[in-house]
């Protein structure tokens, strides 16, 4: 991660203008960026915000959703990772937010619910976003936390923890084996 604060460096990935934490500030920034692009008549600008299902428990997030819908920010795509786990446990026990799709529609979003591990569905969802006008889009991705690494899958303890060297090797071996299987199918 490269610095004393162990955060993502937003300057290392082109197009990633900021990274925030789990308290929901990112979506407020994203709606501001989308509104600014509209104000400046920058029809070429698309803003993407990635949130987790634990993060959408924050009130600030829902205020930003209301703002995005009120101003018809059709240049905003909100991607919500619905894996059912957060650092404190299952989202259904900590602060249930289901049904997210109905709530997003009620807040004025177009919604698409997909398998967040299916690349074809992800591509289709983003194509859908690019063809819609008049309202923001929410792509709801049903996922499995730690997918592809046997000892991490659906384990809340891995939410904010890095693997040690031995665990890292096991994880990379498992992921590389899956990659080889996929490449053999092509």
What is each of the regions a protein language model found here?
Residues 1-5:
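Short, small-residue-biased leader/transition segments that mark boundaries at the very start
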Residues 8-186:
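Glycine-rich ThDP/TPP pyrophosphate-binding loop and its adjacent helix/strand module
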């Amino acid at each position: 991660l490269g610095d004393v604060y162990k955060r993502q460096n937003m300057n290392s990935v082109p197009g990633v203008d900021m990274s925030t934490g789990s308290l929901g500030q990112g979506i407020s920034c994203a709606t501001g960026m989308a509104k600014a692009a509209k104000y400046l008549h920058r029809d070429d600008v698309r803003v993407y915000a990635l949130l987790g299902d634990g993060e959408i428990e924050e009130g600030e997030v829902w205020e930003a959703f209301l703002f995005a819908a009120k101003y018809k920010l059709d240049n905003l795509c909100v991607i919500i990772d619905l894996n059912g786990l957060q650092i404190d446990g299952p989202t259904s026990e900590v602060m249930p937010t289901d049904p997210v799709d109905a709530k997003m529609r009620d807040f004025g979003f177009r919604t698409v619910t997909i398998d967040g591990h299916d690349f074809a569905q992800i591509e289709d969802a983003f194509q859908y976003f690019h063809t819609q006008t008049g309202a923001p889009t929410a792509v709801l991705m049903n996922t499995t936390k730690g997918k592809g690494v046997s000892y991490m899958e659906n384990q809340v303890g891995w939410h904010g923890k890095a693997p040690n060297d031995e665990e890292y090797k096991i994880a990379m071996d498992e992921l590389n084996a899956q990659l080889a299987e996929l490449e053999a199918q092509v």
